[in-house]
A protein has these predicted regions:
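Helix-breaking motifs and short loop linkers at transmembrane-helix boundaries and internal kinks
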Residues: 48, 81, 102-108, 136
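Helix-loop-helix hairpin linking two adjacent transmembrane segments in secondary transporters
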Residues: 147-194
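Extracellular/periplasmic helix-loop-helix junction of adjacent transmembrane segments
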Residues: 39-68
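Cytosolic juxtamembrane N-terminal segment immediately preceding the first transmembrane helix
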Residues: 1-31, 45
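Cytoplasmic helix-loop-helix junction between adjacent transmembrane helices
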Residues: 112-152
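Residue-level signature of mid-helix packing/kink "hotspots" within the transmembrane helices
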Residues: 34, 63-71, 121, 155-156
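Flexible cytoplasmic inter-helical loops of multi-pass small-molecule transporters
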Residues: 193-223
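Conserved MFS/SLC helix-loop-helix module at the cytosolic interface between two early adjacent transmembrane helices
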Residues: 68-104
Length: 230
């Protein structure tokens, strides 16, 4: 039994690779989130937006849908295939980022940004749930810290994109590039297997224990209570 526990506590190279891949997706997530803000000096005059309109796009329109849908996505992540949920969200926000790059005015930019918030809200709850099942408890703080580094890295890279890629591609080209990259990564995510849920395995073990106990001791109140609880 002891060797089996130690075996379960071991972290393999593919687990680290999976963590780094999800962290990279988090980097892309935050680059995408910041891109419209850091390109304000180009977007506002070209689309003839007022400060109020641009404030709506970067503030309430995005944040409301991101915050509200984040709650629902956390619930959904507990019930569906999480790798596919991430792939769906990543594909959605990446496609809408491409549409944002083709915007001609307020509405054609506001509508994609609204649903980009929906797509981006899938990543954090599903990724943290996956990592929680993939790594042992003693690694949880480290794992979440690595995943969270994607926020700072993404913020920093968004500024570098403005400095070095905008003169070459323009703001629209940067949107197209990031969106296209995200679509490719979404397809890669679809190829990954779902990580078995740890709590389901523990529930199955408890069910097995209660069943064996019932066979040994007879059909007792304890067995009924355990079965009802599960």
């Amino acid at each position: 039994m002891e060797s089996r526990v130690n075996e379960n506590e071991q972290v393999q190279a593919r687990d680290i690779a999976f963590l780094l891949f999800l962290t990279f997706l988090n980097v892309i997530n935050y680059i995408d989130r910041q891109l419209i803000g850091v390109f304000a000096n180009w977007i506002v005059p070209e689309l003839d937006l007022s400060n109020f309109e641009f404030g709506l796009i970067t503030g309430p329109i995005f944040i409301f849908f991101y915050a509200v849908m984040g709650l629902f996505m956390g619930i959904i992540a507990d019930r569906v295939n999480r790798t596919r949920l991430i792939a769906f969200g990543l594909g959605l926000w990446s496609f809408l980022t491409v549409l944002s790059g083709a915007a001609k005015g307020f509405l054609s930019l506001a509508l994609p940004r609204m649903f980009i918030g929906v797509g981006e809200s899938t990543l954090a709850p599903a990724a943290i749930s996956l990592l929680g099942d993939r790594f042992p408890a003693k690694w949880q703080g480290f794992v979440v810290g690595i995943f969270g580094m994607g926020v700072s890295i993404g913020l920093g890279l968004s500024l570098l994109i403005v400095a070095y890629l905008e003169p070459i591609l323009g703001w629209r080209g940067c949107f197209y590039l990031l969106g296209g990259m995200g679509i490719v990564l979404a397809l890669c995510m679809l190829l990954m297997r779902e990580t078995p849920r740890r709590h389901l395995g523990e529930m199955q073990k408890e069910n097995d224990i209660s069943t064996n106990k019932g066979l040994l001791d007879g059909f007792s109140f304890r067995t009924v209570a355990l079965d009802l609880r599960n």
